[in-house]
């Protein structure tokens, strides 16, 4: 495998399209999962996650067999190369489920924004990435805007705070280590996705069975409903696309950019909620905070896309037509 001395930087278009791809997938899966879990009342979110992991494994394996993509065959070194991603995934999942049930939605949204500064900090520590003062101020503006938006709902729940901050740390660490592990000389982005899903599938099935989640899924009354099955399969496909687009966005940009795109998506959903749906309750403080959040996110996007000082990127030796065309 030959490596040139100077690895080409990804184009501005590649960085932009990968970020838009991630934002779109993240938005769509929220809509589909909301329909499944709320409208249909599907009682088993863990089973839904299992379906998404199984779909990821099947799609990537079929693509590998047909030589559309490449990633290393399994050997005894793979677990060491992937560590600690599976553990971070479990921690992220458990802390996320625990925190959502103990905090109000506005406060949960605020505290989840701390994923962004945690990501910035971990990128500096683990990857050695340095950011300008303007980038740091843009990140702080997003967090400040989130606090202002939820200013009327600053409830305190120590257990909830602990879980959500753990969730932030696990999410940030997962993004940064995913970025680190995607070196084409090692696992590459497809190898990271495939083996992470493989290692997590069996433990997740065990958790689902032991908690009664799997039994609830088998007893669900809508399995003969064609529309439900279509949406369930769509959620599984979108789960794969979300994992893929997250890796792609982190690969061409950074884990920090991926976190900021997620924040911009959340604010965009709030804006849409003002116009349609009827469940947005207007308050001046909330509206001001949302605008500060969006301004910080857009400022970050402008600075990132216009910057000429980009961190080194590994040569993408696994480029396939699926990249940026999904």
Swiss-Prot record:
Residues 1-15, 63-130, 177-189, 247-253, 304-326 are extracellular. One of its GO terms (molecular function) is antiporter activity. Keywords: Antiport, Golgi apparatus, Membrane, Sugar transport, Transmembrane, Transmembrane helix, Transport. It is a multi-pass membrane protein. GO terms for biological process: heparan sulfate proteoglycan biosynthetic process. GO terms for cellular component: Golgi apparatus; Golgi membrane. The keyword Membrane applies. The keyword Magnesium does not apply. It catalyses: UMP(out) + UDP-N-acetyl-alpha-D-glucosamine(in) = UMP(in) + UDP-N-acetyl-alpha-D-glucosamine(out); UMP(out) + UDP-alpha-D-glucose(in) = UMP(in) + UDP-alpha-D-glucose(out). The chain crosses the membrane at residues 16-36, 42-62, 131-151, 156-176, 190-210, 226-246, 254-276, 281-303. It is found in: Golgi apparatus membrane. Residues 37-41, 152-155, 211-225, 277-280 are cytoplasmic. InterPro entries: Sugar_P_trans_dom (IPR004853), TPT_transporter (IPR050186). Nucleotide sugar antiporter transporting UDP-N-acetylglucosamine (UDP-GlcNAc) and UDP-glucose (UDP-Glc) from the cytosol into the lumen of the Golgi in exchange of UMP. By supplying UDP-N-acetylglucosamine, a donor substrate to heparan sulfate synthases, probably takes part in the synthesis of these glycoconjugates. PANTHER family: SOLUTE CARRIER FAMILY 35. Belongs to the TPT transporter family. SLC35D subfamily. This is Nucleotide sugar transporter SLC35D2. It comes from Mus musculus. The gene is Slc35d2.
């Amino acid at each position: 495998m030959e490596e040139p001395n100077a690895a080409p930087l990804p184009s501005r278009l590649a960085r932009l399209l990968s970020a838009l791809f991630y934002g779109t997938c993240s938005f769509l899966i929220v809509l589909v999962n909301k329909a499944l879990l709320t409208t249909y009342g599907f009682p088993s979110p863990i089973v839904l996650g299992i379906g998404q992991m199984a779909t990821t494994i099947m799609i990537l394996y079929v693509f590998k067999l047909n030589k559309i993509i490449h990633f290393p065959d399994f050997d005894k070194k793979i677990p060491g190369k992937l560590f600690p991603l599976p553990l971070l995934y479990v921690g992220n999942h458990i802390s996320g489920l625990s925190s959502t049930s103990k905090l109000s939605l506005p406060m949960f949204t605020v505290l989840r924004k701390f994923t962004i500064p945690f990501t910035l900090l971990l990128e500096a520590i683990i990857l050695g990435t340095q950011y300008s003062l303007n980038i740091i101020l843009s990140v702080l503006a997003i967090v400040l805007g989130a606090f202002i938006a939820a200013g009327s709902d600053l409830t305190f729940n120590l257990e909830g705070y602990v879980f959500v901050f753990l969730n932030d740390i696990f999410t940030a660490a997962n993004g940064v280590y995913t970025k680190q592990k995607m070196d084409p000389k090692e696992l590459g982005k497809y190898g990271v996705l495939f083996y992470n899903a493989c290692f997590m599938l069996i433990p997740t099935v065990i958790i689902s069975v032991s908690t009664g989640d799997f039994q609830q899924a088998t007893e669900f009354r809508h399995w003969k409903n064609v529309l439900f099955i279509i949406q369930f399969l769509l959620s599984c496909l979108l789960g794969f696309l979300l994992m893929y687009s997250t890796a792609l966005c982190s690969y061409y940009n950074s884990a920090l950019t991926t976190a900021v795109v997620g924040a911009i998506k959340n604010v965009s959903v709030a804006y849409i909620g003002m116009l349609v749906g009827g469940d947005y309750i207007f308050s001046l403080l909330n509206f001001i905070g949302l605008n500060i959040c969006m301004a910080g996110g857009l400022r970050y996007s402008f600075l990132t896309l216009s910057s000429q000082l980009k961190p080194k990127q590994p040569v993408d030796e696994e480029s396939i037509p699926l990249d940026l065309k999904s």
